[in-house]
């Protein structure tokens, strides 16, 4: 019951459901893997991922390696989104350092595919111009 209440509170605060619902987040992430070439699974051991990405985008492998979630215009690392993610990770656990996890994984929220994603990964939905910061959100509100 508490999880349901947390989800309602998250939505009321303007947070995407996937920032607070791990099952929804993992479902959306799996869809990104299956349908949008989200990866590599382990950025430290990419094993052919970048070669495949280069073929998808018709660019060199070196160029494909620059097309990361961390510089995608759908990658939201604004203060407000980081708070949404931190609140969702922490939940009711007072001993959890959610920001440490966010920082170590370089997490942001993908506004296109609706899940928490790592800045060191990439996918077919990548577009230039990111990431989204609080400053960008303030500009769009004007």
Please name every model-derived segment:
Residues 4-142:
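Cysteine-centered metal-binding/redox modules
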């Amino acid at each position: 019951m508490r999880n349901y209440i947390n989800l309602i509170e998250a939505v009321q605060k303007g947070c995407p459901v996937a920032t607070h619902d791990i099952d929804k987040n993992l479902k959306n992430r799996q869809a990104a893997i299956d349908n949008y070439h989200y990866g590599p699974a382990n950025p430290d051991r990419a094993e052919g991922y970048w070669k495949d990405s280069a073929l998808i985008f018709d660019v060199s492998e070196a160029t494909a390696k620059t097309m990361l979630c961390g510089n995608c215009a759908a990658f939201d690392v604004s203060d407000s989104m980081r708070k949404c993610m931190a609140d969702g990770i922490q939940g009711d656990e007072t001993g959890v350092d959610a920001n440490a996890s966010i920082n170590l994984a370089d997490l942001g929220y993908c506004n296109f595919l609706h899940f928490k994603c790592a800045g060191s990964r990439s996918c077919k939905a990548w577009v230039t111009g990111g990431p989204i910061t609080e400053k960008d959100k303030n500009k769009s509100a004007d």
